[in-house]
Amino acid sequence: PYRRQRQMCIRDRHNEYGLIYSLPQTHLDIEVVATKTTRKAGPYYQYAEKYLGIPGAITQDSEEWALSSVKVTPYGVPDPEEQYLMQFKPGGNGYIVLDENGLLLSINTEPVIDSIVSTAPKQKQESPLDNNEYAKVYSAELLMSASTVKMAEVAAKQLYRIRESRLNLVTGEVDELPADGESFKLIIQQLDEQEAALTALFMGTTQTETIIKHFDYIPVEEVTNDIVFRISDLYGIVKPENLSGAPVYLSLKITEEGELPIDNKGNIKKMPKNAVAYAIPGKAEVILSDGKKTLFKENLPIAQFGVVFGLDPSIFTDKKAPSCATFYPQTGAIRQIGK
């Protein structure tokens, strides 16, 4: 969200009129995606190979976590040390656009809005073993069985009958076919669900889901192997101080420091009077690793590794051809400037 300010007057301590805006401090949004895998053993797992002829049944319940991805995105937070007053001439048509936090987005034109696009979590699919849902497909014969081995035998026979019924439907070897296509799909779906539930009694089920957490990191200086979060086998994504997890490290190396512009003679340009301040950010290589492999590596713009300069405010109030400009809210740098 942003707001356009047209001739909005704010009085500062110098008794001048204009609009106060902020340049940003660059923060890093660290998005962490972890996958949780839940395995559940079926009550007849020990009979899977005997009655179904299938090895590899899950023999005990378990949960495990694995790191799926890490993404780092810079974003801007107003820097209280970098607040500026932009003055307006009475009766002028110029305007500036700020975001909801007071960061400068554009002057005399509509802004380009950047946003952090978060990864959507993947929900855990239902399992026939959840809350003993498989009991819904128990036949009367199975319910009357006196022992576990007998129940497994009856469940296997019921499973084979379901498979045979589905095959007969598909091949048309039934006394009466469903009335229409939708009825046929519904019957096949019901048979599939019953087969899945009975198979789960022997083979167990595996469910996966993704959990997403965000961590805020403020670059201040170069760092090596700063722990930003951990991955725990028991709890998934946890904070750095939770020693139950394996650490994930952030290293930051400044690759470019923002410098003040120079003129044709190689001298540093003078700041224009009542300048419209903007940032010339630096850059830093940001690396995240688990100590063995690199999870993320990118060169990112960072406002606090640069400098602040300014534009001559008169270019925005020229009556014949006023200039316009857009800015990056992540760094306060000029995105584009023109007429």
Which role does the model predict for each range below?
Residues 4-7, 11-339:
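N-terminal amphipathic/basic membrane-interacting segments and domains
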